[in-house]
Amino acid sequence: WHIGAAAHYAQIDMIARTARMNGKNVYFPIGIDRNGLPVELYTEKKHGIRMRETERGKFLDLCKDALDDLEAEMILIMKNLGLSCDFDNYYRTDSKEYRALTQATFIELWKNDSIYLATRPNNYDWVTGTTIADAEIIYEELPTKLVHMKFKTKDGEVIIASTRPELLCACKAVIVNPKDVRYTDLIGTKVTVPISNQEVEIQAHHSAQIEFGSGAVMVCSYGDHNDVALFRELDLEEVIAIGQDGRLTEAAGAYAGLKPKQARTKIIEDLESKGFVEKIEEISHRTPVSERSRAPIEIIPMEEFYLKQKGSVEKMRELGSQIKFYPKMHQQILMNWLDSIKIDWPISRRRYYGTEIPIWYCKKCSEPYLPEPGEYYQPWYLECPAEKCPKCGFTEFVGEERTFDTWMDSSISPLFITKFKKDEEFFKRTYPTAVRPQAKDIVRTWLYYTLLRCENLTGKKPWSEAWIMGYGLDEKGMKMSKSKGNALDP
């Protein structure tokens, strides 16, 4: 914790105390969020180890020990602040009871066909080795090179500008704007991609910006999400140029094994030496990076579990408009996020310290088996509860190793504290809750995902009011963060 977090909780306490003074019967639970990537990174750094090189059970124990120490410090600060919450019954998001509820909600949504398994291009954080959702991405202006490259035509050349020349091997088309008269006669003809030498077609497409670079754009798998959309629309065959280790694959030929930045430097050198470069510009580029690792993300086809959300956007907009925001302007953060949703939510992660996805697969026919809800399951560690596969009768299973996105846990906190699926009378009395106090930087994650999940499971919004706090700032006006070293200890 730092002083900003302490101030945040002190203000939450003021809300609770004011309600009591107005004669209300206040339910003020306190929870400790103990899942996710931060504790894994903390544990790796503290012990000088790597998660994937450590036995899973041992790594989980080390994470739990670290969390126990951090939690004790956090609770002490809360008590010293004089918070009036219920310390005798505070909950942890990594408890068996909490994780069992997360798994139970997954099983219910699976049976309702709200969750599915699919292989799609996903945001991939190669530093942490897992898929991440759009909500876990931020954009930073980073320096890079805009390389104007010569693609050979039958009678000449076309200049194409790109910040990702390392993906030339994955180029499957070149697009130009149909209104760009410079390329009218070239639409439908072929060009040869430099270095990798494959022939691709020049196609007309409205997304090509006439004013950017030369106006001609290479379409590769995958430089950005526009490439993803174009590959689907134009029915192009993808080339997996970057692997899960964050390095170029064999598809890159002589550049295989290099990290993208290394490959970019080497390919630019080779392009220049072979006469394929018209010019190079030093630019500042709006780059998508992982919110956690701050590494530029790659887009890699991976099999993941998805929770349907595209079809719920208008419903979320309706519910969001019914929630009273304090201050009112922060309601727009939610609305802007709803406007940006284009894909379903990838909810599976390739990490260790999180709630496990409760599925076993038949070793013979691969049929998934989901157990009865109510218990906490660890498929990577425990035997399948089923004696035989319900589809083929085979008796051997293999457990799912992936965990949930931590927001799958956090998003059901209103359900857990109101004893959803546990005490129907208490649930009816306390749900929906009155107010959600939280920081504004997680409106598009915690607030939105809670709204989505709770509506999916109950048909109701989880609260009627949202109190949104800003950031604790240092003397320079920068957001306080322990990682930046500018935070004050409360």
Model-derived features with residue positions:
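Short conserved beta-strand and strand-loop elements enriched in small hydrophobics
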Residues: 147-151, 188-195
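Active-site cores of enzymes that catalyze phosphoryl transfer or operate on phosphate-rich substrates
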Residues: 191, 291-295, 411
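N-terminal catalytic cores of NTP/NDP-binding nucleotidyl/phosphoryl-transfer enzymes
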Residues: 1-42, 102, 161-163, 195, ...
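Conserved active-site neighborhood of enzyme catalytic/cofactor-binding cores
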Residues: 1-30, 125, 138-150, 217, ...
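Residue patterns forming the tRNA-binding/recognition surfaces of aminoacyl-tRNA synthetases
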Residues: 44-158, 212-365, 446, 478, ...
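Short active-site loop/helix that positions an aromatic residue
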Residues: 41-45, 166-177, 227-236, 415, ...
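Carboxylate/His-rich catalytic cores and anion/metal-binding grooves
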Residues: 23-32, 165, 171-190, 400-404, ...
